Amino acid sequence: MVKFSKQFEGQLVPEWKDAFVDYWQLKKDIKRLQAAEAEAAGVAATTPLSQCQAPVAAAHWVMRLPFLHPHGHHHKEHGAIQVHRKLASGGGGGGGAVAGEVYETELVDGGAGFADGEAARAFFARLDEQLNKVNRFYERKEAEFVERGESLRRQLQILAELRAAVVAEQQRDGRRRRCGNGGDSSPPDTEDPSVSCSILHGDQSLRGTSEQEQEGQEKLTKDMIARSPDEGDDDQLTIPQELGDSGRLGRPREEAANTRPRTTLPGGRAVTCQGRSVRINIPVTTPTRTVTAIRELLFDDMLSQSRRSGSANGTKCGDKLSINKRKVHQAEKMIRGALIELYKGLGYLKTYRSLNMMAFVKILKKFDKVTAKEAQSIYLKVVESSYFNVSDKVIRLMDDVDELFVRHFAEGDKRKAMKYLKPNQREESHTTTFFIGLFTGGFAALFIGYCIMAHIAGMYTQQSNKVYMATSYPVLSMFSLFFLHLFLYGCNIFMWRKTRINYTFIFEFTPTKELKYRDVFLICTTSMTIVIGVMFAHLTLIVKGYSSCAVQAIPGALLLVFLLILVCPFNILYRSCRYHFLTVIRNIILTPFYKVVMVDFFMADQLCSQVPLLRSLEYLACYYITSSYKTQDYGYCTRVKHFRDLAYAVSFLPYYWRAMQCARRWFDEGDINHIVNLGKYVSAMLAAGTKVAYENDNSAGWLSLVVIVSSLATIYQLYWDFVKDWGLLQFNSKNPWLRNDLILKQKYIYFLSMGLNLILRLAWLQTVIHPNIGSLDSRVTLFILAALEVIRRGHWNFYRLENEHLNNAGKFRAVKVVPLPFHEVEED
C-alpha cells in the first residue's frame, strides 16, 4: 500500500507545492511529540507507585484494555483543544466561512495533558499556519479565476456580435453584387467580406485609464508565452448572438461595466461596432501577423493625416476599419485557448482543495494516535467549515466553462469538448519496452560486428581508406551525434518526471501528443539499429572491393530515407511530433519574425551543440548533389570557394539564430538581460569563425586569436550557464554558492555538475593541441570531442529546466496566461 506522503507528493500541482499543506514538517512535529510521549511513558514505568496512585493508575490501564473497547480504539480525552476563528483585521468571526478568516488553536489547561506541552503548542501553531495559508491561497486563486471567467464571458459576447456583423456584411455584399449584375450602376465590392466599423483614434478611445491598469495589461501581455494552436481557416464555429443568458459565469455586462473600469491595451486600434467600442489586439507571433501589423500601422498614419486635413478643410472624414473573417477566427482561437487554460486551472484548484483536506485528515489522525487525545473531530470541524472547503465557486465555474465550451466550440458534442478540456493521457505499453530491449540487443550485436570489421580493415587509422573516411564516415558520425542527443533527451525526460519538473507545461506540449521517454528510447534504438545495419552492409561491400556508384550512394540513400520519413505526411511514425519538430526548426530559421517561446530557444541552444553535425550535413549535401560520389572526388567540396565559405556560414548559423532570438525577446519584453545574452552568442560566433579560419590557415597569428577569443567566450558562457541558466552561485542563498530552492537533495551533485560543465566547455582546446588517440584518424578524435559537447548539452538541459520550473513555482504559475483579443474602451 502506497503511503499517503508519496501519494500526496505525486498528485500535488508542482508549481503550487509551497502553497500546499507542509505535510512533511507536520510529520516531524508529530515525531517529536511521539518521542516525548515515549519518554514520559518510560519514566512512568520506572517510577514506583504510591498507595494513592496505584488504584488510579491501575484503573487507567484497565480502561485501555482492548476487550473493553469493541471497536479497537483506546479511550481518548475530549476537549483537548479549542479553535478560535477571527477575521484577519481583528474582528470576531461569524458562524459561517468568511473570506479573510484566520484560525488560532488554544490548548485546554495550557497543555498540561500532554507529555510535552511546548511541542503540542508548536504543532498546533504550525497547523493553524498551514490552514490559514491554504485559505489565503485558495481565496486569491479563486478570485483570479472568477475574474478571468467574467472577462471570457464578455469576450464571447463581443465575438458573437462581431461574427453576426460579419455575416450581415456578407449578406449585404451578396445583395450588392446581385444588384450590380442586374444592371445597377454602383460598382460591386471586390474586397474580402468584412464588417466595416468606424475607427476610434487613440486620442478618443481612452478616458480615465489608470496607470495601474495599463501596467497590469502590459504585464499580462509580456508574461504570455503561449501560442494558439495552429488550425486551418476552414474551422468556422457558430456562436449565437444571445450568449450567456442562462449561464452563471460572471455578472451581466451592464453591471460589470458600472462596478469596475474597463482595461485597455496601450496602442492598437479601437472600433465601434454594434454600439460597442472595442480595441482588438491579435499578438504578433508570425510573419503574416507582423506584416499585417505594419500594414495597419501605415494605414493608421494615412488615416490620421487624412483626418487632420479633412478637419482643416471643415469636412467630415469617416474612418472605416475592415475586420475580416480571418481576424475574427484568430480571436476565436485565442478565446478558446483561454477557456481551456481556465478549465485546467480550475481543475488544479479542485485538486488543491481535495488533497489539502485529505492531508489535514491524515495528520490529525496521526496526532490522535500518538497522543491519545480527541483533537481530530474538533479541528476537522473547523477545517470542514473553512473557506477553501465550503466555497463552491470553483465547481460552479467549471460547470459554466464546460457548458460554454460544449455550446460554442464543440457544436453541442460533450465528448468532443472533453478532448480539449480533459485530454486523456496516452497509456504506456509494455510492447514499447519489449521492442526497446529487442532493438538494443540488435544494435549492440551489429555495432560490435561493425567495429571488428572496421578494425580488421584498418578503416579508422591514419593510413585508412581516405575515400571511406571522407564520404561514408560523416554519415555514421552524423546519425550517431543526432541519436545520442535524442537519447540524452529521453534521459532528461525520465529525470524531469522523476523529480516532478513540469516540462510539458514549460515546453507547452500537448499531453496527448508528447513523446514519453520510452518513445524516445524506442526511436533511438530502432533508428540506430537500421543505421548501423546499413553501414555494416556497406562496409562489407567496400572491404570486398565493390566500389561502383551504387555502393557509394548507399550512405546518401540512407540519409535521404530518414529525411523523407521526417517530412512524411501520413499519420505514422509519430507524425505530430515530427511536424512539431519541423515547426520549431522553421521558427528558429525565421527567428526575427516569430514570437520566441521556450521550446524555440531551447531547441536553438541544442543546435549550438550540433555544429559538427550541421557541417557534416552541408558537406554531404554538396558531395551528393554535385554527383561527386560517381567520381569519388571527395575533395571537390573543400576546393571550391563558395562551398568553403558556406562552411563559415554553417558554423555561424546556430549562434546567429540564437542571437536573433535574444533580439526579438528584447524587442517584445524590453528586458536588458536579453541584450547581454545576445553578446554571449556573438562571442561564440567569433570563436567559431576563428576556429574555421585556423583550420584553413594554420598560422601562429590565427592560433593566438583562437586562444584569446575562445577563452573570453568560454568565461562568458560559463558565467551565463551557472548564474543565469542554472540560477546557481547565489552568495546570499541559504544553500551557500547554490540557490535557495533545490530539487535534488544531494547538494554536492550541483558542485560536481558545475565542475563537469567547466571541463566539457574546454573542448575547444583540441583546436590548439591537436590531440591524437593512438593511431586513430583525426576525424574519429573530432567525433569523440563532438560527442562530449552533446553530452554536456544533455547534462545542461536538466538544470536549465529545473531553474525554469523553480521560477514558475516561485510565481505559482501553473497555467498559461493567454491574452484576450478584445478590450472594451470608453469614448468621450
Swiss-Prot record:
UniProt topology in membrane: Multi-pass membrane protein
Subcellular localization, as worded in the UniProt entry: Cell membrane
Keyword terms: Cell membrane, Membrane, Phosphate transport, Transmembrane, Transmembrane helix, Transport
Name of the gene: PHO1-3
Purpose: May transport inorganic phosphate (Pi).
Stated name of the protein: Phosphate transporter PHO1-3
InterPro entries assigned to the protein according to its UniProt record, in alphabetical order: EXS_C, PHO1, PHO1_SPX, SPX_dom
Expression induction or repression: By Pi deficiency in roots and shoots.
Any single GO CC term annotated in Swiss-Prot or TrEMBL for this entry: plasma membrane
Start and end residues of each EXS domain: 638-828
Presence of keyword Transmembrane helix: yes
GO terms assigned for molecular function: inositol hexakisphosphate binding; phosphate transmembrane transporter activity
Organism of this sequence: Oryza sativa subsp. japonica
Gene Ontology process terms (BP): cellular response to phosphate starvation; phosphate ion transport
